[in-house]
Design a protein with these regions (language model features):
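Short pre-active-site segment immediately N-terminal to the catalytic Zn-binding motif
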Residues: 158-179
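Short Cys/His-rich micro-motifs in 6-15 aa windows
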Residues: 24-34, 77-86
Length: 306
């Protein structure tokens, strides 16, 4: 995530800041500028084109720090959410704040990398939308269906998430990870078409395989022997769809961590764009960085980061 500076006093700002603690200026995130900008006393902002922006209406209930275009109540990120927990569901609403924060994070990440985000509408029924649901009173299945991503906001609870992670024997499980994985499914449907489809099949396998049958096989037999040489995770071995989504998610994990390391002066190597392939980025930048970060975690008595 990009490092930000207050435009009034040049103090450091972080992605979710709504106030500069140094000079006291109210702040809001401009998706158009990919930057945190100072607000007027009334909570407004006028950009270089003369367009007017205001604080998102979800600032209170979702902790949103983004700006909405004049005439719109919601910012771009919040407008993608089709369903949220009922306001009487206190637990669900608390968890919903965490889910929305993760969604804002990944949208900026996708914008930075140039991935197209086309919202669902009457004219675009398979566009991107989110159902952020509470499992307090009903079962919620995380997944993707024709552009609609469903997230169980209970995954924001560390104890719940760790219990599920241990049960499924997963090395990594976070709210941000769920968004990245499900967005992998979405972008496969958007980007993997035409000639690219055959290339994807060469890499990930035939996506027309019976999905339920492959799920049953995976949970009854486990991953194939030697899976580590061809897959990013055991979950990726289940079906070509999951292989693509897992690979996409880990691509975002790796890219974000490298970018953060560079932003905060932890790396002095050549930029990722100077490498020919992403494999070269992994070998040249990611492996040395992940080893160092794992050692730092172990020095604090924690498990490895990656």
């Amino acid at each position: 995530m990009k490092a930000f500076r207050c435009r009034v006093c040049d103090a450091a700002l972080y992605f979710e800041n709504y106030l500069c603690t140094t000079c006291g200026t109210s702040q809001g995130f401009s998706r158009d500028e990919r930057s945190i900008v100072p607000l007027t006393a009334e909570g407004g902002y006028v950009d270089a084109t003369g367009a007017r922006w205001t604080v998102c209406a979800n600032a209170g209930i979702a902790g949103c720090t983004w700006l909405a275009a004049e005439g719109n109540q919601l910012c771009f990120s919040c407008s993608l959410t089709r369903t949220r927990p009922h306001h009487d569901d206190a637990v669900g609403m608390t968890q919903y704040v965490v889910a929305e924060r993760a969604k804002r994070h990944v949208i900026v990440e996708l914008d930075t990398l140039g991935f197209p985000i086309n919202p669902r509408s009457e004219d675009n029924p398979t566009g991107l939308a989110f159902d952020l649901l509470s499992s307090v009173a009903e079962n919620v299945i995380i997944g993707h269906d024709n552009g609609l991503i469903t997230i169980d906001v209970a995954e924001s609870d560390i104890a719940h998430r760790e219990k599920v992670r241990a049960k499924l024997d997963e090395p990594y499980r976070t709210m941000l990870g769920h968004f990245r994985h499900e967005l992998g499914h979405y972008f496969e449907t958007v980007l993997v078409q035409g000639d690219v489809l055959e290339r994807a099949r060469d890499l990930f396998g035939d996506e027309t395989k019976d999905y339920q049958a492959e799920i049953d096989r995976h949970y009854s037999e486990g991953p194939p022997d030697g899976w580590e040489s061809s897959y990013i995770s055991t979950y990726a071995t289940m079906h070509p769809y999951e292989d693509f989504a897992e690979t996409f998610a880990h691509y975002l994990h790796i890219n974000e961590t490298i970018d953060n390391a560079r932003q905060f002066g932890l790396m002095n190597a050549a930029p990722a764009t100077s490498f020919t392939t992403f494999r070269d980025v992994v070998i040249g930048l990611w492996i040395p960085l992940s080893i160092a970060l794992n050692q730092i975690n172990r020095g604090m008595g924690r498990e490895r980061l990656y």
